[in-house]
Each structure stands twice: as structure tokens, then as C-alpha cells.
């Protein structure tokens, strides 16, 4: 094998289709575009979503919902997540370091999902009534 003998595998390369270059090429005259109509003409393509003047689907359907501007700054943490943490005291910094909440989060709330079997002190976080009861039942407390 020499460098001058190297070539691509058979069938791996295809010649570019040259259209509109005479009748003998097999792709002359209309160049594969058919006869007449918008798509046969130069520049004859409509924009995405255009339905020929009919009211397009994206405008027929009503607008719904909104984007919350506070979503990035508030987070929820489950009892299951807290159970997995090694820390005896849990605050926002501990949650950020563990990757349970994002870096932008300013406040977090503990929700009752999963079980808590060990004593944990929650500092500076909100908690639902169910989560509060579960934390206190496990011997933990919620500090302000």
C-alpha cells in the first residue's frame, strides 16, 4: 500500500447533481422541479408555517401561560434529598454545594416527598406543614 494508491471505498462518494445543463444530462429543462407553480420558480418558497393565506395554525391557537421571572431564584428540596445529605445542619449553602439547587437560588423550601429517618437541623429554609411534621418526628428542628 502506497499513498498514491489510496482511494475512497467504492460507493462512498457521490457526484454532485448538476441540474439544468441540457437535455442529455437527464436533468435538463425543468431541472427536476416539474412544470409551473410557485415551487418551480426562482425564489419560489414560502416561509415556515405559511399556509397559503389561510390563518396559520400557530395563530389559530390561543396563547397560554407565562414565563415566571422568579423561577430561577426559588427552589424545592425534598425530604428524600435531605436524607441523602451527610450534613446534620442544612442551609442554602449546603444545598448549593451538594448541587441540589442552582447557584442563582435565593430561597428554597423543603417539601414532604420521601422519608426522613435521622435528626437534621434546617436553617434559613422554608418548609411545608407536612415536611415540618416529618422533620420534628425524626428528632430534628427548623431554625429561623
Curated annotation (Swiss-Prot):
Q: Name one GO molecular function term.
A: rRNA binding
Which Gene3D superfamilies does the UniProt entry name for this protein?
3.100.10.10
Spans annotated as Disordered: 1-48
Q: Please tell me whether the keyword Transcription regulation is annotated for this protein.
A: no
In terms of domain of life, where is this protein from?
Bacteria
Cite a single Pfam family from the UniProt record.
Ribosomal_L27A
Keyword flag Chloroplast: no
A single Gene Ontology biological process assigned to it is: translation
Q: Where is the composition biased (Gly residues)?
A: 21-31
Identify the InterPro entries for this entry.
Ribosomal_uL15 (IPR030878), Ribosomal_uL15/eL18 (IPR021131), Ribosomal_uL15/eL18_sf (IPR036227), Ribosomal_uL15_bac-type (IPR005749)
Q: Which GO terms describe its cellular component?
A: cytosolic large ribosomal subunit
- What does the UniProt keyword field contain? Ribonucleoprotein, Ribosomal protein, RNA-binding, rRNA-binding
Q: Report the protein's function.
A: Binds to the 23S rRNA.
Q: Which family does it belong to?
A: Belongs to the universal ribosomal protein uL15 family.
Q: Which NCBIfam families match?
A: rplO_bact
Subunit and partners:
Part of the 50S ribosomal subunit.
Q: What is this protein called?
A: Large ribosomal subunit protein uL15
What is the organism of origin for this protein? Cupriavidus necator (strain ATCC 17699 / DSM 428 / KCTC 22496 / NCIMB 10442 / H16 / Stanier 337) (Ralstonia eutropha)
